[in-house]
């Protein structure tokens, strides 16, 4: 089952970029574009091979209320292709765009965390992990907005952080209301 690779490939590449590529930006570019290309190939393969089926993958060996459930249906396949295509083309474009900045490996590590969060939001099967992946994407996007280090970017990042905190609070309240009404966080049981 290839479903967990949508999360592990960009997460592992973000870790490796932070660990290995901290001194050389070329390694960060190579690792991130390789991860982006592999995600694009994997998502296109999933879209072709899916045949209208729904795949469910339980991460770990825990039962459903505790374990992480990943779900891939036709809409998730299409969304994964779109996220992979846009993120890969953004990575290719950003090589030239951020070339003048220092420590570009941080940009690529944050970008891979953003992809991890977006992919997790698409394929998660429960509301708690949806919130966790949404927060991963939100925090990495916040850091990417402030990445350039200029006053306008910090102002935009602050505004984004305020809106993100408000939206996260509202989502968490909504999840609490749904949990109190249904006694489950699994989306398929609601």
Each PLM stretch: what is its role?
Residues 49-67, 170-190:
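Juxtamembrane/interfacial segments at transmembrane-helix boundaries in multi-pass membrane proteins
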Residues 17-22, 117-123:
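Hydrophobic alpha-helical transmembrane segments
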Residues 23-37, 99-113, 128-131, 149-170:
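Membrane-interfacial loop-to-helix junctions in multi-pass inner-membrane proteins
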Residues 5-9, 31, 78-79, 119-141, ...:
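Hydrophobic alpha-helical membrane segments of integral membrane proteins
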Residues 41-50, 118, 142-152, 172:
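Juxtamembrane membrane-interface segments at transmembrane alpha-helix termini
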Residues 1-5, 14-109:
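Transmembrane helix-loop-helix hairpins at membrane boundaries of multipass inner-membrane proteins
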Residues 21-22, 49-51, 125, 148-150, ...:
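Short helix-capping/hinge motifs at transmembrane helix termini and TM-loop junctions
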Residues 13-16, 31, 38, 79, ...:
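Hydrophobic residues within membrane-embedded alpha-helical segments of Major Facilitator Superfamily
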């Amino acid at each position: 089952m290839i479903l967990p690779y949508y999360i592990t490939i960009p997460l592992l590449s973000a870790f490796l970029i932070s660990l290995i590529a901290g001194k050389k930006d070329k390694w960060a570019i190579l690792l991130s574009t390789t991860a982006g290309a592999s995600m694009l190939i994997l998502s296109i393969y999933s879209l072709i091979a899916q045949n209208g089926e729904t795949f469910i993958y339980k991460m770990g060996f825990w039962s459903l209320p505790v374990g992480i459930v990943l779900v891939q249906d036709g809409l998730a396949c299409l969304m994964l292709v779109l996220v992979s295509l846009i993120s890969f083309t953004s990575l290719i474009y950003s090589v030239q765009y951020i070339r003048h900045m220092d420590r570009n490996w941080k940009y690529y590590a944050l970008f891979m965390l953003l992809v991890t969060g977006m992919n997790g939001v698409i394929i998660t099967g429960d509301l708690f992990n949806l919130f966790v992946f949404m927060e991963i994407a939100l925090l990495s996007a916040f850091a990417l907005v402030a990445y350039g280090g200029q006053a306008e970017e910090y102002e935009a990042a602050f505004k984004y952080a305020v809106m993100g905190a408000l939206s996260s609070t509202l989502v968490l309240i909504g999840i609490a209301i749904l949990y109190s009404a249904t006694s489950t966080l699994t989306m398929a049981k609601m």
